[in-house]
Protein backbone atom coordinates (compact mmCIF):
# COMPACT_ATOMS: atom_id res chain seq x y z
CA UNK A 1 0.00 0.00 0.00
CA UNK A 2 1.35 3.42 -1.00
CA UNK A 3 1.77 5.74 1.97
CA UNK A 4 -0.57 8.73 1.44
CA UNK A 5 1.69 11.07 3.38
CA UNK A 6 4.42 10.53 0.77
CA UNK A 7 2.20 10.82 -2.33
CA UNK A 8 -0.62 13.31 -1.66
CA UNK A 9 0.44 16.78 -2.95
CA UNK A 10 -0.47 18.58 0.31
CA UNK A 11 0.54 15.83 2.73
CA UNK A 12 3.88 15.56 0.91
CA UNK A 13 4.74 19.19 1.82
CA UNK A 14 3.80 18.61 5.48
CA UNK A 15 5.75 15.33 5.46
CA UNK A 16 8.92 16.96 4.11
CA UNK A 17 8.61 19.85 6.59
CA UNK A 18 7.59 18.19 9.86
CA UNK A 19 7.79 14.38 9.65
CA UNK A 20 10.55 12.92 7.43
CA UNK A 21 12.67 16.09 7.60
CA UNK A 22 16.34 15.10 8.16
CA UNK A 23 17.48 17.02 11.27
CA UNK A 24 20.92 17.20 12.95
CA UNK A 25 21.01 14.77 15.88
CA UNK A 26 22.73 17.23 18.23
CA UNK A 27 20.55 20.37 18.13
CA UNK A 28 19.86 21.64 21.65
CA UNK A 29 16.88 23.30 23.33
CA UNK A 30 17.99 26.59 21.70
CA UNK A 31 16.50 25.20 18.47
CA UNK A 32 13.04 24.97 20.11
CA UNK A 33 12.31 28.68 19.75
CA UNK A 34 11.31 28.50 16.07
CA UNK A 35 8.38 26.20 16.85
CA UNK A 36 7.57 28.21 20.01
CA UNK A 37 7.36 31.37 17.87
CA UNK A 38 4.98 29.53 15.54
CA UNK A 39 2.83 28.65 18.53
CA UNK A 40 2.93 32.24 19.82
CA UNK A 41 1.78 33.46 16.39
CA UNK A 42 -1.16 31.02 16.37
CA UNK A 43 -2.17 32.04 19.93
CA UNK A 44 -1.97 35.75 19.01
CA UNK A 45 -4.00 35.33 15.80
CA UNK A 46 -6.73 33.29 17.54
CA UNK A 47 -7.07 35.51 20.64
CA UNK A 48 -6.79 38.62 18.44
CA UNK A 49 -9.55 37.41 16.13
CA UNK A 50 -11.98 36.94 19.03
CA UNK A 51 -10.99 40.30 20.55
CA UNK A 52 -11.58 42.01 17.18
CA UNK A 53 -15.17 40.69 17.21
CA UNK A 54 -15.93 42.91 20.22
CA UNK A 55 -13.51 45.83 19.77
CA UNK A 56 -14.51 49.17 18.19
CA UNK A 57 -11.82 51.32 16.58
CA UNK A 58 -13.33 54.70 17.43
CA UNK A 59 -11.71 57.23 19.78
CA UNK A 60 -14.94 57.65 21.76
CA UNK A 61 -15.60 53.94 22.34
CA UNK A 62 -12.24 52.09 21.99
CA UNK A 63 -11.33 52.30 25.69
CA UNK A 64 -14.88 51.37 26.75
CA UNK A 65 -14.96 48.45 24.31
CA UNK A 66 -11.81 46.97 25.92
CA UNK A 67 -13.42 47.38 29.38
CA UNK A 68 -16.59 45.76 27.96
CA UNK A 69 -14.54 42.78 26.67
CA UNK A 70 -13.03 42.27 30.13
CA UNK A 71 -16.31 42.66 32.04
CA UNK A 72 -19.15 41.43 29.85
CA UNK A 73 -17.78 39.05 27.20
CA UNK A 74 -17.54 35.35 28.17
CA UNK A 75 -13.89 34.78 29.11
CA UNK A 76 -13.09 38.16 27.55
CA UNK A 77 -10.72 38.96 30.41
CA UNK A 78 -8.81 35.76 29.62
CA UNK A 79 -8.62 36.53 25.90
CA UNK A 80 -7.31 40.01 26.60
CA UNK A 81 -4.76 38.84 29.18
CA UNK A 82 -3.54 36.04 26.92
CA UNK A 83 -3.22 38.44 23.98
CA UNK A 84 -1.38 41.16 25.93
CA UNK A 85 1.00 38.76 27.71
CA UNK A 86 1.28 36.57 24.61
CA UNK A 87 2.99 39.54 22.94
CA UNK A 88 5.59 39.57 25.73
CA UNK A 89 6.17 35.82 25.35
CA UNK A 90 6.44 36.31 21.57
CA UNK A 91 9.21 38.91 21.97
CA UNK A 92 10.99 36.88 24.66
CA UNK A 93 11.15 33.93 22.23
CA UNK A 94 12.14 36.27 19.37
CA UNK A 95 15.10 37.74 21.25
CA UNK A 96 16.29 34.28 22.34
CA UNK A 97 15.87 32.99 18.76
CA UNK A 98 17.95 35.87 17.33
CA UNK A 99 20.54 35.44 20.11
CA UNK A 100 20.82 31.74 19.26
CA UNK A 101 21.36 32.68 15.60
CA UNK A 102 24.20 35.06 16.50
CA UNK A 103 25.87 32.67 18.98
CA UNK A 104 25.87 29.61 16.72
CA UNK A 105 26.50 31.42 13.41
CA UNK A 106 23.08 30.59 11.90
CA UNK A 107 23.21 34.01 10.17
CA UNK A 108 25.48 32.45 7.52
CA UNK A 109 22.28 31.06 5.95
CA UNK A 110 21.86 34.56 4.51
CA UNK A 111 18.40 34.26 2.92
CA UNK A 112 16.87 32.67 6.03
CA UNK A 113 18.55 35.31 8.23
CA UNK A 114 17.41 38.28 6.10
CA UNK A 115 13.81 37.05 5.98
CA UNK A 116 14.08 36.61 9.77
CA UNK A 117 15.17 40.24 10.23
CA UNK A 118 12.25 41.39 8.04
CA UNK A 119 9.98 39.21 10.22
CA UNK A 120 11.38 40.86 13.37
CA UNK A 121 10.65 44.33 11.94
CA UNK A 122 7.12 43.28 10.92
CA UNK A 123 6.37 41.84 14.37
CA UNK A 124 7.67 45.06 15.98
CA UNK A 125 5.40 47.13 13.71
CA UNK A 126 2.43 44.89 14.59
CA UNK A 127 3.11 45.20 18.33
CA UNK A 128 3.45 48.99 18.06
CA UNK A 129 0.13 49.54 16.25
CA UNK A 130 -1.53 47.00 18.57
CA UNK A 131 -0.41 48.89 21.67
CA UNK A 132 -2.27 51.98 20.42
CA UNK A 133 -5.64 50.20 20.13
CA UNK A 134 -6.84 50.23 23.80
CA UNK A 135 -6.60 54.06 23.55
CA UNK A 136 -5.24 54.55 27.06
CA UNK A 137 -2.90 57.39 28.03
CA UNK A 138 0.29 55.49 27.15
CA UNK A 139 -1.30 54.18 23.92
CA UNK A 140 -2.05 57.72 22.76
CA UNK A 141 1.21 59.34 23.86
CA UNK A 142 3.32 56.41 22.69
CA UNK A 143 1.72 56.71 19.25
CA UNK A 144 2.23 60.50 19.28
CA UNK A 145 5.92 60.31 20.23
CA UNK A 146 6.89 57.47 17.87
CA UNK A 147 4.95 58.66 14.80
CA UNK A 148 6.33 62.17 15.44
CA UNK A 149 9.82 60.77 14.76
CA UNK A 150 8.88 60.66 11.07
CA UNK A 151 8.86 64.47 11.08
CA UNK A 152 12.65 64.33 11.60
CA UNK A 153 13.08 63.15 8.00
CA UNK A 154 14.31 66.15 5.98
CA UNK A 155 11.91 67.83 3.53
CA UNK A 156 9.12 65.19 3.49
CA UNK A 157 9.00 64.47 7.26
CA UNK A 158 6.01 66.60 8.30
CA UNK A 159 3.95 65.55 5.27
CA UNK A 160 4.77 61.90 5.99
CA UNK A 161 3.74 62.18 9.67
CA UNK A 162 0.42 63.86 8.74
CA UNK A 163 -0.16 61.21 6.07
CA UNK A 164 0.28 58.41 8.66
CA UNK A 165 -1.97 60.29 11.14
CA UNK A 166 -4.69 61.05 8.59
CA UNK A 167 -4.87 64.59 10.04
CA UNK A 168 -2.79 67.07 12.00
CA UNK A 169 -2.41 64.88 15.10
CA UNK A 170 -3.06 61.33 16.35
CA UNK A 171 -6.87 61.02 16.24
CA UNK A 172 -9.79 58.88 15.06
CA UNK A 173 -8.33 58.33 11.57
CA UNK A 174 -5.04 57.13 13.12
CA UNK A 175 -6.78 54.66 15.42
CA UNK A 176 -8.93 53.23 12.60
CA UNK A 177 -5.96 52.67 10.26
CA UNK A 178 -3.83 51.24 13.08
CA UNK A 179 -6.58 48.69 13.74
CA UNK A 180 -6.59 47.80 10.03
CA UNK A 181 -2.78 47.41 10.06
CA UNK A 182 -2.91 45.35 13.26
CA UNK A 183 -5.44 43.00 11.67
CA UNK A 184 -3.62 42.46 8.36
CA UNK A 185 0.02 42.31 9.54
CA UNK A 186 -0.19 38.91 11.34
CA UNK A 187 -1.28 37.32 8.05
CA UNK A 188 1.66 38.95 6.26
CA UNK A 189 3.87 37.59 9.09
CA UNK A 190 2.41 34.10 8.50
CA UNK A 191 3.29 34.33 4.78
CA UNK A 192 6.83 35.48 5.66
CA UNK A 193 7.16 32.56 8.12
CA UNK A 194 6.41 30.15 5.25
CA UNK A 195 9.17 31.81 3.16
CA UNK A 196 11.51 31.71 6.20
CA UNK A 197 10.93 27.94 6.53
CA UNK A 198 11.24 27.44 2.76
CA UNK A 199 14.74 28.94 2.77
CA UNK A 200 15.67 27.06 5.97
CA UNK A 201 14.70 23.72 4.42
CA UNK A 202 16.83 24.50 1.34
CA UNK A 203 19.96 24.27 3.51
CA UNK A 204 18.80 22.29 6.56
CA UNK A 205 19.27 23.36 10.18
CA UNK A 206 22.56 24.53 11.64
CA UNK A 207 23.75 22.81 14.85
CA UNK A 208 25.71 23.82 18.00
CA UNK A 209 29.09 22.66 16.65
CA UNK A 210 28.69 24.72 13.46
CA UNK A 211 30.09 21.89 11.29
CA UNK A 212 28.24 20.12 8.46
CA UNK A 213 25.79 17.66 10.09
CA UNK A 214 24.93 15.69 6.91
CA UNK A 215 26.71 12.56 8.18
CA UNK A 216 24.52 12.33 11.30
CA UNK A 217 20.84 13.20 10.81
CA UNK A 218 17.64 11.79 12.29
CA UNK A 219 13.97 12.18 11.24
CA UNK A 220 12.14 15.16 12.74
CA UNK A 221 9.26 12.92 13.89
CA UNK A 222 9.19 11.48 16.56
CA UNK A 223 12.46 12.87 18.01
CA UNK A 224 11.89 16.60 17.61
CA UNK A 225 8.09 16.59 17.61
CA UNK A 226 8.18 15.29 21.20
CA UNK A 227 10.92 17.78 22.08
CA UNK A 228 8.83 20.64 20.63
CA UNK A 229 5.77 19.36 22.53
CA UNK A 230 7.71 19.75 25.79
CA UNK A 231 8.60 23.33 24.75
CA UNK A 232 4.92 24.03 23.97
CA UNK A 233 3.86 22.84 27.42
CA UNK A 234 6.49 24.95 29.19
CA UNK A 235 5.58 28.04 27.13
CA UNK A 236 1.85 27.55 27.74
CA UNK A 237 2.46 27.03 31.45
CA UNK A 238 4.53 30.25 31.66
CA UNK A 239 1.95 32.21 29.63
CA UNK A 240 -0.97 30.94 31.74
CA UNK A 241 0.83 31.71 35.03
CA UNK A 242 1.54 35.23 33.73
CA UNK A 243 -1.97 35.81 32.32
CA UNK A 244 -3.85 34.35 35.31
CA UNK A 245 -1.78 35.43 38.32
CA UNK A 246 -0.05 38.63 37.23
CA UNK A 247 -1.68 39.89 34.01
CA UNK A 248 -0.80 43.58 34.41
CA UNK A 249 2.78 43.26 35.68
CA UNK A 250 4.32 43.97 32.26
CA UNK A 251 1.91 46.78 31.33
CA UNK A 252 1.94 50.48 32.20
CA UNK A 253 -0.46 51.79 34.88
CA UNK A 254 -1.05 54.93 32.75
CA UNK A 255 -2.87 52.77 30.21
CA UNK A 256 -5.74 52.27 32.68
CA UNK A 257 -6.64 55.93 32.11
CA UNK A 258 -8.45 56.87 28.89
CA UNK A 259 -6.40 58.86 26.36
CA UNK A 260 -6.32 62.58 27.10
CA UNK A 261 -4.53 64.82 24.56
CA UNK A 262 -4.47 67.67 27.14
CA UNK A 263 -2.57 65.74 29.81
CA UNK A 264 0.91 64.35 29.13
CA UNK A 265 2.08 61.44 31.35
CA UNK A 266 5.28 62.25 33.32
CA UNK A 267 7.25 59.39 31.70
CA UNK A 268 6.31 58.27 28.21
CA UNK A 269 7.74 54.82 27.52
CA UNK A 270 6.86 51.88 25.26
CA UNK A 271 6.37 48.23 26.28
CA UNK A 272 9.45 46.47 27.75
CA UNK A 273 10.41 44.78 24.47
CA UNK A 274 11.05 48.15 22.77
CA UNK A 275 12.94 49.77 25.65
CA UNK A 276 16.44 48.86 24.39
CA UNK A 277 15.77 50.63 21.06
CA UNK A 278 14.03 53.53 22.87
CA UNK A 279 17.12 53.97 25.09
CA UNK A 280 19.35 54.17 21.98
CA UNK A 281 16.93 56.71 20.43
CA UNK A 282 17.01 58.89 23.58
CA UNK A 283 20.78 58.69 24.05
CA UNK A 284 21.38 60.95 21.02
CA UNK A 285 20.44 64.60 21.70
CA UNK A 286 19.55 65.21 18.02
CA UNK A 287 16.14 64.16 16.65
CA UNK A 288 17.27 62.90 13.23
CA UNK A 289 20.41 61.32 14.72
CA UNK A 290 18.25 59.48 17.27
CA UNK A 291 15.91 58.16 14.57
CA UNK A 292 18.87 56.93 12.50
CA UNK A 293 20.42 55.24 15.57
CA UNK A 294 17.03 53.62 16.34
CA UNK A 295 16.83 52.19 12.81
CA UNK A 296 20.50 51.16 12.85
CA UNK A 297 20.04 49.28 16.15
CA UNK A 298 17.72 46.80 14.38
CA UNK A 299 18.99 46.96 10.78
CA UNK A 300 22.55 46.22 11.99
CA UNK A 301 21.36 42.59 12.12
CA UNK A 302 21.34 42.59 8.30
CA UNK A 303 25.10 43.19 8.09
CA UNK A 304 26.10 40.64 10.76
CA UNK A 305 26.80 37.96 8.07
CA UNK A 306 29.27 40.39 6.41
CA UNK A 307 31.09 40.91 9.73
CA UNK A 308 31.84 37.20 10.25
CA UNK A 309 35.64 36.89 10.25
CA UNK A 310 36.19 33.59 12.09
CA UNK A 311 37.19 30.34 10.39
CA UNK A 312 34.69 28.60 12.67
CA UNK A 313 30.97 29.10 12.26
CA UNK A 314 29.78 28.64 15.85
CA UNK A 315 31.02 30.37 19.00
CA UNK A 316 31.03 27.00 20.78
CA UNK A 317 34.84 26.73 20.69
CA UNK A 318 35.65 30.48 20.67
CA UNK A 319 35.95 31.74 24.28
CA UNK A 320 36.83 35.38 23.41
CA UNK A 321 33.81 35.73 21.10
CA UNK A 322 31.65 34.04 23.75
CA UNK A 323 32.74 36.61 26.33
CA UNK A 324 31.88 39.47 23.95
CA UNK A 325 28.51 37.87 23.15
CA UNK A 326 27.58 37.75 26.86
CA UNK A 327 28.79 41.35 27.30
CA UNK A 328 26.44 42.27 24.42
CA UNK A 329 23.59 40.42 26.17
CA UNK A 330 24.27 42.26 29.45
CA UNK A 331 24.49 45.52 27.48
CA UNK A 332 21.03 44.96 25.95
CA UNK A 333 19.58 44.24 29.40
CA UNK A 334 21.18 47.50 30.63
CA UNK A 335 19.66 49.41 27.68
CA UNK A 336 16.23 47.88 28.46
CA UNK A 337 16.55 49.09 32.07
CA UNK A 338 17.69 52.59 30.98
CA UNK A 339 14.79 52.88 28.49
CA UNK A 340 12.35 52.64 31.39
CA UNK A 341 14.10 55.31 33.51
CA UNK A 342 13.46 59.08 33.45
CA UNK A 343 15.75 61.32 31.35
CA UNK A 344 18.11 62.50 34.09
CA UNK A 345 21.63 61.76 35.36
CA UNK A 346 23.10 59.19 35.84
CA UNK A 347 20.72 57.39 33.45
CA UNK A 348 21.59 59.65 30.49
CA UNK A 349 25.33 58.89 30.56
CA UNK A 350 24.78 55.15 31.26
CA UNK A 351 22.42 55.01 28.24
CA UNK A 352 24.93 56.82 26.01
CA UNK A 353 27.80 54.53 27.05
CA UNK A 354 25.63 51.42 26.58
CA UNK A 355 24.52 52.65 23.12
CA UNK A 356 28.13 53.25 22.00
CA UNK A 357 29.17 49.84 23.39
CA UNK A 358 26.29 48.13 21.52
CA UNK A 359 27.51 49.34 18.11
CA UNK A 360 31.19 48.97 19.06
CA UNK A 361 30.71 45.31 20.04
CA UNK A 362 28.88 44.33 16.85
CA UNK A 363 30.84 46.43 14.33
CA UNK A 364 34.39 46.32 15.75
CA UNK A 365 35.10 44.07 18.74
CA UNK A 366 33.38 40.84 17.62
CA UNK A 367 34.93 40.84 14.09
CA UNK A 368 38.36 41.58 15.65
CA UNK A 369 37.88 38.74 18.16
CA UNK A 370 37.18 36.37 15.24
CA UNK A 371 40.42 37.41 13.50
CA UNK A 372 42.41 37.08 16.75
CA UNK A 373 41.00 33.58 17.38
CA UNK A 374 41.99 32.57 13.82
CA UNK A 375 45.54 33.78 14.53
CA UNK A 376 45.68 31.95 17.89
CA UNK A 377 44.66 28.66 16.24
CA UNK A 378 47.36 28.81 13.56
CA UNK A 379 50.24 26.37 14.18
CA UNK A 380 53.24 28.37 15.41
CA UNK A 381 56.01 25.93 14.45
Curated annotation (Swiss-Prot):
Q: Where does heme b b562 bind?
A: 83, 182
Give compartment(s): Mitochondrion inner membrane
Q: Which Pfam families match?
A: Cytochrom_B_C (PF00032), Cytochrome_B (PF00033)
Sites where the protein binds a ubiquinone:
201
SUPFAM superfamilies hit by this protein: a domain/subunit of cytochrome bc1 complex (Ubiquinol-cytochrome c reductase), Transmembrane di-heme cytochromes
**Topologically, how does it sit relative to the membrane?**
Multi-pass membrane protein
> What Gene3D superfamilies does the annotation carry?
Cytochrome Bc1 Complex, Chain C
Q: Where are the transmembrane segments?
A: 33-53, 77-98, 113-133, 178-198, 226-246, 288-308, 320-340, 347-367
Which biological process annotations from GO are given for this protein?
mitochondrial electron transport, ubiquinol to cytochrome c
Which UniProt keywords are listed?
A: Electron transport, Heme, Iron, Membrane, Metal-binding, Mitochondrion, Mitochondrion inner membrane, Respiratory chain, Transmembrane, Transmembrane helix, Transport, Ubiquinone
Where on this chain does heme b b566 bind?
Answer: 97, 196
Q: What are this entry's molecular-function GO terms? A: metal ion binding; ubiquinol-cytochrome-c reductase activity
Q: How does it assemble?
A: The cytochrome bc1 complex contains 11 subunits: 3 respiratory subunits (MT-CYB, CYC1 and UQCRFS1), 2 core proteins (UQCRC1 and UQCRC2) and 6 low-molecular weight proteins (UQCRH/QCR6, UQCRB/QCR7, UQCRQ/QCR8, UQCR10/QCR9, UQCR11/QCR10 and a cleavage product of UQCRFS1). This cytochrome bc1 complex then forms a dimer.
What does the UniProt function comment say about this protein?
Answer: Component of the ubiquinol-cytochrome c reductase complex (complex III or cytochrome b-c1 complex) that is part of the mitochondrial respiratory chain. The b-c1 complex mediates electron transfer from ubiquinol to cytochrome c. Contributes to the generation of a proton gradient across the mitochondrial membrane that is then used for ATP synthesis.
Supply the name of the protein: Cytochrome b
Source organism of this protein record: Sarcophilus harrisii
* Record gene name: MT-CYB
Amino acid sequence: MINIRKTHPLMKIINHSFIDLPTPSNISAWWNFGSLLGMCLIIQILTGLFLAMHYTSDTLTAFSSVAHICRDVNHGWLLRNLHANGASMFFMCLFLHVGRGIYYGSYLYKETWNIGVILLLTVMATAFVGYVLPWGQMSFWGATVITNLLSAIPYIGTTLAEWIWGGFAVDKATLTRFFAFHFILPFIITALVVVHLLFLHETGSNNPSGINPDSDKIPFHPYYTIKDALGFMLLLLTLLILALFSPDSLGDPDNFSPANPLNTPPHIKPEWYFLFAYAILRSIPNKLGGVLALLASILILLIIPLLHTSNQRSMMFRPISQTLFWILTANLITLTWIGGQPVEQPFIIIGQLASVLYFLLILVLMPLAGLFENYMLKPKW
